[in-house]
């Protein structure tokens, strides 16, 4: 394998995971903060808010997992070789 392609693939894999986790990380923090605020305002709606929060957190985390899949594909099944 060409060392330049190998080095670029490792850098791209690191960037894929890093950049793919920035947006969901910010979104998860904002969603959790808003959920806590909503529960503080309406404690009787805690179950509904928590269920919606967990579902939305799972969808946000899926974006990070997609970045991990791209990184693993670049490292172990490199299409540029």
Swiss-Prot record:
Membrane-topology annotation of the record: Multi-pass membrane protein
Subcellular localization, as worded in the UniProt entry: Plastid, Chloroplast thylakoid membrane
Pfam families: ATP-synt_C (PF00137)
Chief site of localization: plastid
Residue(s) at site: Reversibly protonated during proton transport: 61
Transmembrane segments: 7-27, 57-77
Any one GO cellular component localisation term in the record: chloroplast thylakoid membrane
InterPro entries assigned to the protein according to its UniProt record, in alphabetical order: ATP_synth_csu_bac/chlpt (IPR005953), ATP_synth_F0_csu (IPR000454), ATP_synth_F0_csu_DDCD_BS (IPR020537), ATP_synth_F0_csu_sf (IPR038662), ATPase_proteolipid_c-like_dom (IPR002379), F/V-ATP_Csub_sf (IPR035921)
GO molecular function, one term: proton-transporting ATP synthase activity, rotational mechanism
Keywords: ATP synthesis, CF(0), Chloroplast, Hydrogen ion transport, Ion transport, Lipid-binding, Membrane, Plastid, Thylakoid, Transmembrane, Transmembrane helix, Transport
Domain of life: Eukaryota
Note: In plastids the F-type ATPase is also known as CF(1)CF(0).
Similarity remark: Belongs to the ATPase C chain family.
Function: F(1)F(0) ATP synthase produces ATP from ADP in the presence of a proton or sodium gradient. F-type ATPases consist of two structural domains, F(1) containing the extramembraneous catalytic core and F(0) containing the membrane proton channel, linked together by a central stalk and a peripheral stalk. During catalysis, ATP synthesis in the catalytic domain of F(1) is coupled via a rotary mechanism of the central stalk subunits to proton translocation. Key component of the F(0) channel; it plays a direct role in translocation across the membrane. A homomeric c-ring of between 10-14 subunits forms the central stalk rotor element with the F(1) delta and epsilon subunits.
Name of the protein: ATP synthase subunit c, chloroplastic
Lineage, uppermost ranks: Eukaryota, Viridiplantae, Streptophyta, Zygnematophyceae, Zygnematophycidae
Gene (name only): atpH
């Amino acid at each position: 394998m060409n060392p330049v392609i190998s080095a670029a693939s490792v850098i791209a894999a690191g960037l894929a995971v890093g950049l793919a986790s920035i947006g969901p990380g910010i979104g998860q923090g904002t969603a959790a903060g808003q959920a806590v605020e909503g529960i503080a305002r309406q404690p009787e709606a805690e179950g509904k808010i928590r269920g919606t929060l967990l579902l939305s957190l799972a969808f946000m985390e899926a974006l990070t997992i997609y970045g991990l899949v791209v990184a693993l594909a670049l490292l172990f099944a490199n299409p540029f070789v």
